[in-house]
Amino acid sequence: MISYASTTRSITVIVRPIYLDEPSDLLGREFAFGYAISIENTGSAEVQLLQRRWIIQEANGSRQDLTGDGNLRPHPVIPPGETHVHNESCTIESFNGTVKGNYLVQRADGEQFRVSVPPFPLHAAAN
């Protein structure tokens, strides 16, 4: 499985996307994808994930802009040297697309900043 990674201010985000045969419906133009996400804190202060934003661009020109908690309830705290892992999914109407985005995080001192999610492709039947 191919991984995509980016680091912002000592927070590394690694994404591993996969096409999901089930529940995809080729005739109904519904293509489902899952992605495992690892968020590693290599800094010296703990951070808490507050929000995520996904921008999903489909090959047919359609775009989804999703902002909110997603699968981040309760809001995970990641101590220095630790990694938080969770899964997300989406359904698109095209065979192909791309996803990019960011996480809003907060340090223990209250400082908030955005951590980039590496852009990654969605390719139907690419498994």
Residue positions per predicted region:
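Short acidic, flexible loop segments centered on an aromatic residue
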Residues: 45-64, 105
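Short beta-strand segments
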Residues: 11, 47, 64, 111-115
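Terminal connector regions
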Residues: 3, 91-127
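Asparagine-centered strand-capping/turn motif at beta-strand->loop junctions
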Residues: 39-43
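Short, solvent-exposed loop/turn segments enriched in Ser/Thr/Gly
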Residues: 30-36, 99-100
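Intrinsically disordered, low-complexity Pro/Gly/Ser/Thr-rich segments with frequent PxxP/GP/PP motifs
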Residues: 65-96
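Short glycine/serine/proline-enriched coil/turn segments at secondary-structure junctions
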Residues: 25, 46, 93-97
